[in-house]
């Protein structure tokens, strides 16, 4: 099928090239041809009649083609009415030749056929010109085919060769009109008309090798639908699973056969009317060829679809055959399993029959034993009633004792709670008193410290004054010595000078005053030193008293605080033990009540069962009292262990607080350590968060690239 389609496409390309060359030759010859006036007048009536017939034929074929080509996608046909051009002619002018122009574009496969029919004018003033009929057929995959002699076989099909490299088709449409004189006879006009008809009959000929096969190849192109139908009949039948597929195939085959039959009939009609409408025949044949090429493309598409469906159905049949083989294997395996199961069932049935026989014998033995146990039942019933009464009495006594013990434990717990509250209040009062005393001691210490500071300031002032007085005393002694030296010098000099004597006396008076001031300053200095020593002694005594008082108060407060904490822990442990004992007693009481109810229910059930049946049941046996659960046994030891752990934690916390309170460097070190740990954790969390975000972004990008 593919080789046939390739051959048809090669044929269409050859026709296109030859048609273009013929059109160019005819356009060159049209300008050179001139016919006599007598020939023009004689053939005017015949050409007008042939023009009318051709127009009627074109209208009917247009209707038929429009109805037949609606199913083909991308096909548009348009007929352009013949246009008239005014041509100035005289009696000696002649009519132009008939032109058949066909343009086939290889890219778009568009077929355009232009048919121009010039008409002769009756006189010199008429403006009638050549009639041009143009038809455009637009399709992406269509081609055209023509038959040489107009006979299209409908019954036989000849397969074309895979390729036609040497075939060429030359389309020659020309009308050779003989020149005649102005006074020609009717016989010459008849001869010219006959020659025109003969020239129109020879439309297509193949000058190259294989002339006889051209008609056969064109006939093969026309009968594409018939060949496809025959190939469909020759293909092996494939089981179709869907009825819709069959209906679609039948519908497509019917529509294609109907369209091809209509086009064939139209082509036959056109070829039969070749003599009367020569030029119309070429146009119709071109249209038929275009329609057949479009149908050929449609049939190619349908054939491809059918081949795809055929391959799909073959795959389905293969899968169905494989599944059938698999099911047959499963069936054989199931049959073998059924035989095995049947044999095993027969064996099991035989074993069950033997078991039934043994059970029947055992039932007989049990019936005999039941008859013997009926005698024992009456004696056991009396024993059971007495045991139940004793059990009820014991349970009531135990319940009463547990209630009394629970009440005593509750009273003890209340007393301990009240005593604990009282001790707690006393401890709080003592703590407040100690706090007041500590505040008073701190205020007294501050006051003593302030007095000591004031006295130290006074001592410093006195020391400064003493230093000043000592410096003044030394200066006065120096002046006194200077005066004595001067006095001695003056005595050695002239003793009779009165002024010098007066001056010496004045100097002596000054020396006396200076000595007196020195003595006074020394006395004041001694007094101040005595007072300073006294203040120093008082300060030392006050410091000793303050240190002794603060140390004693601190030790007393620590001792009292330790005693209170120990007492508080002891009371708390007592409360916990009392609460655990109370919970254990309540749980045991609830358990005993529950067991009592269960025993009563069992007694009622046993009584009902004794009345209903006379057989012995194992459920009516006496049940022993269950001991307390294991975790209740370990409650006492667990409470003591918990108390020891709490005491250990509390003592460790107290020691740590004392150590930190006494050593400020340790407090600072602990503070810096906590800050460092906090900052390190923040940095670590931030770093891990950044890494997690980077991993999430990388995973998202990988997922996007994968998608």
UniProtKB/Swiss-Prot annotation:
Location of this chain's protein in the cell: Golgi apparatus membrane
Low complexity composition-biased segments: 38-47, 83-95
Compositional bias of kind Polar residues: 68-80
Residue span of region Disordered: 22-106, 121-196, 234-256
Record-level GO BP terms: Golgi organization
UniProt domain comment: The C-terminal domain (558-707) is necessary and sufficient for Golgi targeting.
PANTHER family according to UniProt: GOLGIN SUBFAMILY A MEMBER 5 (PTHR13815:SF7), GOLGIN-84 (PTHR13815)
Protein name: Golgin candidate 1
Species this chain originates from: Arabidopsis thaliana (Mouse-ear cress)
Taxonomic lineage: Eukaryota, Viridiplantae, Streptophyta, Embryophyta, Tracheophyta
